[in-house]
């Protein structure tokens, strides 16, 4: 019987990581790629979704296939995870309208949060 493979990719704040495993849970290949946050103003932290998120997914999936020599048709599932509830406005074709605002570290709405807390 032909072996089945499973790919997992995680996009994080500073890097994206990927792993390819077989049906026994053995690691066949791993790959990590770094990406940078932009800091356009004090307390503002952003990612370029096309480059950092989609680009990393493409780089990692291709690297895992190349390193492992596994045929893409033998990969039965791909699981992804990513950083938390970031803000990425998109157009009607789901194309980013701006860089993503990173949840948890971007502080540009601090004043608005305090106003909201005062009314809860």
Functional labels for PLM-detected ranges:
Residues 1-99:
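N-terminal glycine/serine-rich phosphate-binding loop of ATP-dependent small-molecule kinases
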Residues 118-120:
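Conserved small/polar residues in nucleotide/adenosyl-binding loops
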Residues 106:
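Carbohydrate-associated surface elements
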């Amino acid at each position: 019987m032909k072996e089945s493979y499973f790919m997992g990719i995680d996009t994080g704040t500073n890097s994206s990581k990927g792993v390819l495993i077989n049906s026994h849970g053995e690691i066949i290949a791993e790959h990590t790629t770094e990406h940078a946050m932009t800091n356009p103003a004090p307390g503002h932290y952003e990612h370029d979704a096309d480059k950092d998120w989609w680009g990393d997914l493409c780089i990692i999936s291709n690297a895992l296939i190349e390193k492992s020599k596994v045929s893409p048709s033998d990969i039965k599932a791909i699981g992804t995870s990513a950083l938390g509830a970031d803000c990425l406005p998109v157009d009607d074709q789901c194309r980013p309208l701006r860089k993503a605002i990173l949840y948890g570290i971007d502080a540009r709405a601090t004043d608005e949060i305090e106003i909201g807390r005062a009314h809860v």
